[in-house]
């Protein structure tokens, strides 16, 4: 009996050798900071700034997904919650390619949101077995997919493009696989600005077709993600399906600002100090 008990106990670590949650594929999302800031509410001071050195397209995240369009989130991971100390060795590069566009929030708040919600779930795959591995692999994906280069034939430009133009421009980048893209609405001009590109990847990070619901071929089914101001992390404007025509890819120089993305603005630091007075 004792031997049987010991054997059973020895099996426990094997049964729970991986954190995370099983999933079907990954979705890599890159955003166009110019569109995000142009679509942001300009009436709020310092509400959106593009840090100096930010690439034309930057990282939003890498998300485990199920084939039906739903996705796991906030899984058991190692660590369960984001620990900045574990990614110090790559932080200088992360600040550039995975920037915070909202100076009232720290850059770490964006990384924390993405890791806690999505990175922990990816740990069911050995490739993402640690926090450092997750962020490292996401940057590798970003480096291997040249969205900005693929879009050179259509923009940036103040002239509108069509969804067909966009698909044709990125066909080489995506190896002909279907992908998703979403727009943001410019509050002033009411134009639809190309806000993000979402590519679907196999677990080995090779590109695959994205599943669709048939009615809206540029997005997954009824579980489409909403990235609004009521979410944790930087308050990105709400993304929506792009129209078939009159999609704009505005010039980056028209909105860029110099900003230190590693820390909050003066307003943010003052607010933090006020909150800590009673603690």
UniProtKB/Swiss-Prot annotation:
Sorted UniProt keywords: Disulfide bond, Endonuclease, Glycoprotein, Hydrolase, Lyase, Lysosome, Nuclease, Signal
Top enzyme category: lyase
Principal place of residence: other
EC code: 4.6.1.19
InterPro entries: Ribonuclease_T2_eukaryotic, RNase_T2-like, RNase_T2-like_sf, RNase_T2_His_AS_1, RNase_T2_His_AS_2
Gene3D superfamilies: Ribonuclease T2-like
Similarity remark: Belongs to the RNase T2 family.
Protein known as: Ribonuclease T2 protein rnst-2
Organism of provenance: Caenorhabditis elegans
Lineage: Eukaryota, Metazoa, Ecdysozoa, Nematoda, Chromadorea
Gene (UniProt): rnst-2
């Amino acid at each position: 009996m004792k031997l049987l008990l010991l054997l059973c106990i020895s099996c426990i670590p094997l049964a729970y050798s991986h954190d995370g949650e099983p999933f079907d594929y990954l979705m890599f999302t890159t955003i166009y900071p110019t569109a995000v800031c142009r679509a942001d509410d300009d009436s709020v001071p310092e509400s959106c700034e593009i840090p100096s050195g930010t690439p034309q397209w930057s990282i939003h995240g890498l998300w485990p997904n199920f084939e039906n369009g739903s996705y796991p989130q906030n899984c058991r991971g190692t660590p369960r919650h984001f620990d900045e100390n574990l990614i110090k060795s790559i932080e200088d590069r992360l600040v550039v390619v995975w920037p915070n566009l909202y100076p009232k929030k720290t850059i770490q708040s964006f990384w924390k949101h993405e890791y806690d919600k999505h990175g922990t779930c990816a740990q069911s795959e050995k490739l993402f077995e640690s926090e450092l591995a997750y962020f490292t692999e996401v940057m590798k994906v970003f480096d291997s997919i040249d969205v900005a280069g693929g879009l050179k034939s259509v923009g940036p430009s103040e002239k509108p493009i069509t969804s067909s133009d966009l698909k044709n421009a990125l066909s080489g980048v995506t190896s002909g696989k279907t992908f998703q893209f979403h727009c943001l609405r410019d509050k002033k001009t009411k134009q639809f600005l190309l806000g993000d590109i979402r590519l679907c990847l196999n677990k080995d990070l090779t590109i695959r077709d994205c599943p669709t619901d048939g009615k809206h071929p540029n997005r997954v089914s009824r579980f489409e993600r909403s990235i609004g101001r009521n979410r944790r992390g930087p308050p990105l404007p709400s993304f929506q399906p792009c129209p078939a025509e009159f999609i704009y890819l505005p010039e980056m120089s028209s909105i860029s600002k110099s900003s230190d993305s590693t820390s909050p603005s003066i307003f943010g630091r003052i607010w933090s100090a006020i909150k800590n007075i009673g603690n």
